[in-house]
UniProtKB/Swiss-Prot annotation:
Quaternary structure, from the entry: Part of the 50S ribosomal subunit. Forms a cluster with proteins L14 and L19.
Originating organism: Buchnera aphidicola subsp. Acyrthosiphon pisum (strain Tuc7)
Listed GO MF terms: rRNA binding; structural constituent of ribosome
Swiss-Prot/TrEMBL GO biological process terms: translation
Cited NCBIfam families: L3_bact
Name listed for the protein in its UniProt record: Large ribosomal subunit protein uL3
Keyword rRNA-binding part of the UniProt annotation: yes
């Protein structure tokens, strides 16, 4: 299923005719240019590789420069892939625009969440804090026991503990499309999406309708 790579512009709100306020995220979806078409014979799977935006040639390393030169496509700010069916008719240099969402009502959006640094269990996993008083003087925000006894004598894998929060790949599913501005290549979706303002987002038609 193909989609588009875009940029998060920020959040705002729009009003319906009844006066209801809808919080929306504005996503800029400029044309995506196909740089490579992968198939079963050469790559063992079918996909298209796309780029978007513009990157100066002097900011490219040699492998990137050679790849864009071979495809004859204007260098973009990155490379992304979308899986396709075996019988696809995509060609190198072809452009994919925001028009692919004209008949779509909901989308799945993937991005890199904001990094929050090293965080404790209360902030990271919503652990309950311990008593503020009643004899507790040192253990207000500690996780408490992390295991059992001599049996099993270890901490189980996956135990929720303190660690880095955020800066991970996150997908938010089934966000409603509120408006499409084809002239300015803007997509307005209801609600929040992962990532900071200006970060890259992958927008696809929703799997769950």
């Amino acid at each position: 299923m193909i989609g588009l790579v875009g940029k998060k512009i920020g959040m705002t709100r729009i009003f319906t005719e009844e006066g209801t306020s809808i919080p929306v995220t504005v996503i800029e979806l400029k044309e995506n240019r196909i740089t490579q078409v992968k198939n079963i014979n050469t790559d063992l799977y079918c996909a298209i590789q796309v780029t978007t935006g513009i990157k100066k040639s002097n900011r490219l390393n040699k492998p990137q420069s050679g790849h864009f030169l071979k495809s004859g496509v204007t260098p973009g700010r990155g490379l992304w892939e979308f899986r396709t069916d075996k019988n696809n008719n995509f060609k190198i240099g072809q452009s994919i625009t925001i028009n692919i969402f004209n008949n779509v009502k909901k989308v799945d959006i993937t991005g890199i969440s904001k990094g929050k640094g090293f965080s404790g269990t209360v902030k990271r996993w919503n652990f309950h804090t311990q008593d503020a008083t009643h004899g507790n003087s040192l253990s207000h925000r500690v996780p408490g026991s992390i295991g059992q006894n001599q049996t099993p004598g270890r901490v189980f894998k996956g135990k929720k503990m303190a660690g880095q929060l955020g800066n991970t790949r996150v997908t938010v599913q089934s966000l409603n499309i509120v408006r499409i501005d084809e002239r300015r290549n803007l997509l307005l979706v209801k609600g929040a999406v992962p990532g900071a303002t200006g970060s890259d987002l992958i927008v696809k038609p929703a799997i769950k309708v």
